[in-house]
Amino acid sequence: MFLLGSGGKHFEDELRNAGAKILEVEIKRFPDGEKYVRVMGNGDEATVVSSTFYPQDEKIVELLLLGDALREKGFEKLKLVVPYFAYSRQDRVTKDGEPISVRAVMRALGIYYEELYIFDTHNPETLRFFPGKAVNVSPARVIGEYFREKLGDGLVLAPDKGALERARAVAEVLGLEYSHFEKRRISPTEVEMHPVDVDVKGKNVLIVDDIISTGGTMVRAAELLRKLGAKKIYVSATHGVFAEGAIERVSRAVDELAVTNTIPTPVSRISIVPELLKLE
């Protein structure tokens, strides 16, 4: 059965409509600001679901409290699904004295949970920091199906070579061609982009990445595709970690911006619930 933390409540209606069993939990705040959780119901196994978007630290502490409460109730096997995993980009030391933040969080969660599932984690290598079983879940199928009719016989592009595997996964769902943008610095302040080995003229194009934050790269890529004669331009990502004004900037530059609902946003039109149901 599922237990939904405060970062997973937006999945509840769809999960219930699919017939999933959901364990009741009370989550509130003490007058001094500390978090209170109480698990209602009993069982042997539970799958806790909660994204750790803002306020990230609060949601991480909540997951620890939920894990402790479930153990106290006698649950023997606990899975944790964190669709968006905070601190995933803090995966290395760049200055002396810094922590590897993603490692610290994973080790703490590993005290209570045997299995961890993350959707499209920024760096899959960090999964080794979790003491138990850790899995990177691909949203390629749900993203691909959402854009199937819109793209037709178009193509899928990654904004850079590092995201090429993501574009390949979505393209394989659709049976389409895929490639990536190559960046070349032509001055200290200017970077040139171009798609590698594909002709976009007259085609519908989907640009896909793991995270959109400021949206600057997506806007520049879309502007270039317009100049190259692309027909319709779509942008998607697993996680919409949008900085202020980013949704508006990207939306103005493309025909549609649609991300998954690992984080609830106004453009979270692609549901990961079909993938969540496989993890119960």
Swiss-Prot record:
ATP binds at D32, G33, E34, R89, Q90. Its EC number is 2.7.6.1. It comes from the Archaea. SUPFAM superfamilies: PRTase-like (SSF53271). InterPro entries: Pribosyltran_N (IPR029099), PRibTrfase_dom (IPR000836), PRTase-like (IPR029057), Rib-P_diPkinase (IPR005946), Rib-P_diPkinase_arc (IPR037514). Optimum temperature is 50 degrees Celsius. Half-life of the enzyme activity is 55 minutes at 70 degrees Celsius. Pathway: Metabolic intermediate biosynthesis; 5-phospho-alpha-D-ribose 1-diphosphate biosynthesis; 5-phospho-alpha-D-ribose 1-diphosphate from D-ribose 5-phosphate (route I): step 1/1. The active site is at K183. GO terms for molecular function: ATP binding; kinase activity; magnesium ion binding; ribose phosphate diphosphokinase activity. Keywords: ATP-binding, Cytoplasm, Kinase, Magnesium, Metal-binding, Nucleotide biosynthesis, Nucleotide-binding, Transferase. Belongs to the ribose-phosphate pyrophosphokinase family. Class III (archaeal) subfamily. This is Ribose-phosphate pyrophosphokinase. The lineage of its organism: Archaea, Methanobacteriati, Methanobacteriota, Thermococci, Thermococcales. The gene is prs.
